[in-house]
């Protein structure tokens, strides 16, 4: 989880290794309380919003027609979407780690 990073920073991090299925989760810049799952695929970055309901469950906006699923934790959500054909552009393959403080300041 990358916390509060800009969309641009997110895109830079995902584009660095250029691997289809690279992903990260960050806070949404324009929807308070929402998170964004960002995935690199075929030279583009796809963003899916993650919302938390009043009971604390996570749900993600996927492709139209895909049933809504609830997840107890972000880890459960990621585990599910690591499998192919779950409603995202591609399955989650390579988590992009948070840069260390020394790397961010360069």
List the predicted regions and their residue ranges:
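Domain-scale recognition of modular recruitment/scaffold domains used in eukaryotic signaling
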Residues: 1-106
């Amino acid at each position: 989880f990358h916390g509060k990073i800009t969309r641009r920073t997110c895109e830079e991090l995902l584009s660095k290794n250029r691997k289809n299925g690279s992903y990260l989760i960050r806070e949404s810049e324009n929807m308070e309380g929402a998170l964004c799952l960002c995935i690199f695929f075929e030279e583009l970055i796809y963003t899916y919003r993650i919302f938390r309901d009043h009971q604390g469950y996570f749900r993600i906006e996927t492709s139209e027609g895909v049933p809504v699923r609830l997840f107890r934790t972000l880890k459960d959500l990621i585990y599910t979407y690591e499998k192919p054909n779950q409603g995202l552009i591609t399955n989650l393959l390579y988590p992009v780690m948070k840069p260390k403080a020394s790397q961010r300041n360069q």
